[in-house]
């Protein structure tokens, strides 16, 4: 097996900067690829959190004028990750998260900020750094969608480029007038280039021009070729269907390991799963819930948005609580949903607890202490929380969409009879069907043996990066050999 070098280009990476599952993927994939003979470095923006978290940064290139200011490339490490950091203070050193300011609005120069990241990635791929020539570029989501565009319109030899869609809903659409400012020629503004509904489509560019497209589950790869999930890009995705594949995400099973997790009160495995009771008690205390060992405790760890279906959860909450269930919710997002769950916590003291925000340690504690994890998403490219839930023995209750459908085995009669069920699915994705799923979950929870089987099946499911990394390694080698 010949050794390959790959450059991943991404707007976030765990553990340095994270707003969602993209960071978990880009943080775990390089390590997972090592056994396959692939050495992956990752190019990320020099946000303050990144610059403050890297080890031994060394300047390897400088730009006198790069998208409006001086910039430099730093080679650095973070734990096992090999990084290249685009240190451009005029673009990345600012408060807020990577995409929005403290006022909750997108940074007005996002088009330039992420064009810069993409252009730097393409340049590195084409030999910018002496002695480093990656065989493959791997770009992620709209923020790096221009990578294959810069390669395609450079007029120079270029490595193959894979583009991964983590969420088609975020598309990076900007006005045509920025074309020259981002360094693309007029000929790029065409239907088979970066043009999208009269503007520049960063995500569309990646889909149009990458050598291969992946998304993060087989079901989502099919869904996005239809009008319900295609978000206006289904026609292009159908045209490129022979270049599109779905590869499930994994999770970092060293970070998510109930046998050695330092963030939870009691560690456990399938032999000592009874220790989860201590975690449940601690979780109830943390969320101000009644100490009720037998109550069905649901956890939610989610962005609070329409996509995630949490408005439906508010609709069915009274019925769920009437059956004696409890809810521990961790998340942030749309103001009406934040207000709705805060109000529910006040209305149902002892039964509903809500922490608005994100807390990595608390996320681990929910997985380790909740009986079930709710993921009622209207669409879900892959989803990672349900994978963590499986690993931790929190039975996932999920909508039958995208990666949720691919990773959770519904507890229907056949699956229970054959001993393979790992959770509860519902479809179609409506409040009425969610309510039915909750009733079914309560019945399963009341049957101690059936519930324990669901937990053990989940905990013995392989949710690691082993299989996904194998698929990516095969894809890279197919591209190079083509």
Curated annotation (Swiss-Prot):
Any Pfam family the entry gives: Glyco_transf_5
Gene3D superfamilies cross-referenced by the UniProt entry: Glycogen Phosphorylase B
EC number(s) stated in the UniProt entry for this protein: 2.4.1.21
Pathway: Glycan biosynthesis; glycogen biosynthesis
Reaction catalysis annotation: [(1->4)-alpha-D-glucosyl](n) + ADP-alpha-D-glucose = [(1->4)-alpha-D-glucosyl](n+1) + ADP + H(+)
Keyword Transferase: yes
Cystine pairings recorded for this chain: none
NCBIfam families the UniProt entry points to: glgA, PRK00654.1-2, PRK14099.1
Family per similarity comment: Belongs to the glycosyltransferase 1 family. Bacterial/plant glycogen synthase subfamily.
Protein's recorded name: Glycogen synthase
Native species: Rhodopseudomonas palustris (strain HaA2)
Gene designation per UniProt: glgA
